[in-house]
Amino acid sequence: MKKIKCALIGSGNIGTDLIYKIKRSPVLEPVWMVGIDPASEGLARARELGLKTTADGVDGLLPHVLEDGIQIAFDATSAYVHAENSRKLNELGVMMIDLTPAAIGPLCVPPVNLRQHADRVEMNVNMISCAGQATIPIVNAVSRVQGVEYAEIVASLASKSVGPGTRANLDEFTYTTSSAIEKVGGAKKGKALAIINPAEPPLIMRNTIYCLTESAPDQARITESILQMIGEVQKYVPGYRLVNGPSYDGNKVSVFMEVAGLGDYLPKYAGNLDIMTAAATRTAEMFAEEILAGKIKLKTAEVA
């Protein structure tokens, strides 16, 4: 079966984990890995896995985009450089999946709103953050049953799984995730908190989600909605698991989740990597399926 060729930008934890996810895909093929440090482990790993590599940043990739037929790029660098990366690749007709908190494109959580982005042929979609991918489906599961006045999420991440790029973007991580809890999750007000836990051995990613409903919660319908949504996320992140809840206290709905990874690049505790890379891969797959079926055609920036 024909596959859509992909480039990965950023050779850190997220970019390297992405190689494994995309390699398993029936419709995506990783062809290029872009970094800035010739000695980075991610670039070495990419070469071992048969990818072409450059340590000259996106500019090192641009001359090869057309000859190698690259149609989708994943940006796992930093919010500070994403806009420029996206502009350069969009001009060549490459669709960008943004795994930084730059959020210059629409925010995407696959089980909530992926279909509408594919239908609109967006040339840049933003994957928010690992915490956003782990918690916004739950907030949305509550808000689709009844109004949510306030939603707060707390993500606890193993320090070893949080690389320099994510650390440099922690403020953007907070703003983008808080905003997405409102825009995608459907809460009137959203708040996101991240805790980087240095414990050894590293602890699995844990997420706490609190929702305050506008009226007394319809417990049966909310519980059913949450369990259905968890099933949707588990289709692409099998390690996504309900630990406790939903529990109800007045108008407060509390849900406790954990996310185990597949152990592709980092061990299984790094579920935060997996939920991000799996969501990005799922997003790319939907676009790829539509391209292969001839339903959509990516547009170059000049036409857009």
Swiss-Prot record:
Binding residue positions for NAD(+): S11, G12, N13, I14, S161, V162, G163, P164, G165, T166, R167, A168, N169, N272
Alphabetically ordered keywords of this record: Aromatic hydrocarbons catabolism, NAD, Oxidoreductase
Name of the top EC class for this enzyme: oxidoreductase
Reaction(s) the record says it catalyses: acetaldehyde + NAD(+) + CoA = acetyl-CoA + NADH + H(+)
Signal peptide: none
Source species, domain of life: Bacteria
SMART domains: Semialdhyde_dh
GO BP: catabolic process
Catalytic activity, EC: 1.2.1.10
CDD domains: ALDH_C
Keyword Hydrolase: no
Record-annotated active site: C130
GO molecular function: acetaldehyde dehydrogenase (acetylating) activity; NAD binding
HAMAP family found in the cross-reference section: Ac_ald_DH_ac (MF_01657)
NCBIfam families: ac_ald_DH_ac, PRK08300.1
Recorded family membership: Belongs to the acetaldehyde dehydrogenase family.
Protein name per its UniProtKB record: Acetaldehyde dehydrogenase 1
Gene of this entry: lapF
